[in-house]
Amino acid sequence: MSDLIQKAQKVKEASKKLMNLSESQKNLALSCISKKILDNMEYILVENKKDMENAQNKGIKGALLDRLKLTEDRIRQICKGIEDVIKLPDPVGEVISMWKRPNGLIIGQKRVPIGAIGIIYEARPNVTVDAAVLCLKAGNSVLLRGGSEAINSNVALVKTMKEGLIEAGIDEGSIEIVEDTSRETAVAMMKLNEYLDLLIPRGGANLIKTVVQNATVPVIETGVGNCHVFVDESADFEMAEKIVINAKTQRPGVCNAAEKLLVHKNIAESFLPMIVKKLMTKGVEIRGCSKTVEICKQNGIEVKEATEDDWYTEYLDLIIGVKVVDSIDAAIEHINKYGSKHSEAIVTRDYFNAQKFLDFVDAAACYVNASTRFTDGFEFGFGAEIGISTQKLHARGPMGLKELTTIKYIILGSGQVRE
């Protein structure tokens, strides 16, 4: 516990120095970090191999194991992400608006760093770098606490990034990692109001729930993605098939993958057998409503019947829940009841249904005729993201650099006093 406090203190002190660094100083630090990661690739891969072996021994497999894995190509992609962040404009110091009051006061809003940010996340080593790099570019220090599955990889990455900070002449306390991965230490971190200005959890529903229930530090919820694709009665079948297959199978272990497929009843008998067969050839397990099970059975396809819990579940695996709905209104009602307010898609040729979906679905990102897989900082043009916020306060959707800043009011006077 004392180690946690010491690291939190370092992060807090570093945040005071980072807030006034120039864009060129921060970019130099990021460039040094990228170079050090490439230089230390062999060391990082050796440490990642330890994590992979430990995970396999614990029975972790499939998409969850893939999230943990680092390769030379993935490390180069991480470094490319750093270079992309370097190219992004620094939001710190941006004057958002300015106005003059009748009494002569000039009032302005400008962007400033949030300060010291804590990130609690699960088995994805790339988050270690993404989070640190984005926080640093926005003038924030960061205290990282990853999952036990990736501890060797995460420690190796943080040690390497610290080398980059030292080379750039930046306080190495700007990036710290909590090496104790126990639940008790994580909960203690959630209560470090004295040192942390913000806490961002990245992971599954249980992690998010634990943080929200225990944290006294302000929290931005991210990540849980019970995402739907609704195939409307006017949908182009070829387009719908492409979108559903991509949204479910391209990378099933991420939060913007589709977990549920809703199909309008008027096309269910023609569309469902086709899409179910395609999904099954991709290794996807189907969990259907009673109508889905009936239609599939009539076409010689056996599928498992979904339970009520299935409609709430983020699988993060090659599993999809399928439901036949009576109308677009029923689809919207289902999404708003069971969804996680992350990313939702409609496939339709009906302009008015598309507009209704966009207006009435409560989610951070709503799509018309496109895969949910695009809800991502890179795809939105933000560079790397810190997470995808599913709440409505401060930030919503992919969180880039601007979402890691806050507003300061600047008031310029010439001796005014309030009457």
From Swiss-Prot:
Q: Does the keyword Ubl conjugation apply?
A: no
Query: Which reaction is the catalytic activity of this chain?
Result: L-glutamate 5-semialdehyde + phosphate + NADP(+) = L-glutamyl 5-phosphate + NADPH + H(+)
Q: Where in the cell is it found?
A: Cytoplasm
State the CDD domains in the record: ALDH_F18-19_ProA-GPR
Which controlled-vocabulary keywords does the entry list? Answer: Amino-acid biosynthesis, Cytoplasm, NADP, Oxidoreductase, Proline biosynthesis
* Involved pathway(s): Amino-acid biosynthesis; L-proline biosynthesis; L-glutamate 5-semialdehyde from L-glutamate: step 2/2
What does the protein in this record do? Answer: Catalyzes the NADPH-dependent reduction of L-glutamate 5-phosphate into L-glutamate 5-semialdehyde and phosphate. The product spontaneously undergoes cyclization to form 1-pyrroline-5-carboxylate.
PANTHER family for the chain = DELTA-1-PYRROLINE-5-CARBOXYLATE SYNTHASE, GLUTAMATE SEMIALDEHYDE DEHYDROGENASE
Any idea what this protein is called?
A: Gamma-glutamyl phosphate reductase
- Report the gene name: proA
